[in-house]
């Protein structure tokens, strides 16, 4: 069986302008943010006997994150305890430019199951990440910090890394939420 997100989630993730800026200041598509806010829970995580509603804030927060609405994203992901919630907080705070906070949450999250796949997916396009033995959120925070303080050459690499990271962490979160 092929993996598929619910229709609403698929439509939200189809936007080419999303997730382009490593350090966004505001969402480029405010209408999409409104649609995410107004979506009912079943549009994001369909009803099933195995679904884990505790992870729903991460899924909705992930959609906000994807569309650069980081304030909305942190409001959602902040309520979820555990390693996966910590990793999402790390992702959001890093893109907000709160690098020390991001590193702290990254350390708390530890290593998650998708990390080896993420490393393999990113290795060809990221000279920095390819030197690591596993996906390294601490290194990623350092690269974002370098970018923020003037290393514009990192932008393309960071865009690729954040895309791989988002795709795999969102997918992992969704699979956990549906009981796979």
Describe every region a protein language model picked out.
Residues 1-79, 111-180:
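N-terminal alpha-helical interaction modules that lie
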